[in-house]
Structures are given as structure tokens and as C-alpha cells.
Amino acid sequence: MAQLAKFDVPEELTNKALEALELARDTGKIKKGTNEATKAIERGNAKLVLIAEDIEPAEIVAHIGPLSEEKKAPYIYIKNQKDLGAASGLGVSCATVAIVDAGKAAEMIQDIAQKLDALK
């Protein structure tokens, strides 16, 4: 079983990331699902990547963190896939979401990215 190479994220920061996702969903553009998020990261379009921690098997999202590092895309772990699905406007769980157009969440995402850099 693969382990996610993750770092601890304060709950306050994960809540802010989910809030930014909701704002970007309404005023910008997001890519939902691991495949769509992977493509956005590879193309250099991802402004912020949100990854659910509770995905089984972990191999589904194991490549997202290293790929985001390589492409210099900020990424954050969200504890629950249901929360991630709800924030992205889906009625179901979601493993990964990439924000490609921040819309009105641009400043919020920039602030989150700076705080994430300090954590790593």
C-alpha cells in the first residue's frame, strides 16, 4: 500500500482552501477529478491543487504531490473527500480538484500558497 508523502496542514488553512475552492468554482474555473487535475498540473494551469487524504487505494492520488512539486503548483491535503466533493459543487466525493482560474479567489489562493510554502 502506498503512503502519501504529505505534510500536516492546520485546519484553519484547509478551511480557507475549501472556501477559496467554492469561490473559484463560482467565479473562475476548476477541474474536478484526479485525471482532469493531473492534466491541469501538467499543462502548468493549476493555481492550487486540493487532494483528499482519505482516498483508498492511495495510489490513485500518490502522483499528484510530486507532480505538483515538479510543476511548481501549490497543493494542499484535505482530510475528507466528501468535503472536497461538496466544495467543488459535486453531490459525491472527489479525490482531487485543481483550480485553473481563480476568479475572485486569486488573492486568497496567493495567501494560501505562501502559507503552504512555509509549512514544507
Swiss-Prot record:
The keyword Ribosomal protein applies. Keywords: Cytoplasm, Ribonucleoprotein, Ribosomal protein, RNA-binding, rRNA-binding, tRNA processing. Transmembrane segments: none annotated. GO terms for biological process: ribosome biogenesis; translation; tRNA 5'-leader removal. Belongs to the eukaryotic ribosomal protein eL8 family. This is Large ribosomal subunit protein eL8. Part of the 50S ribosomal subunit. Probably part of the RNase P complex. It comes from the Archaea. One of its GO terms (cellular component) is ribosome. The lineage of its organism: Archaea, Methanobacteriati, Methanobacteriota, Stenosarchaea group, Methanomicrobia. Pfam families: Ribosomal_L7Ae. The keyword Iron does not apply.
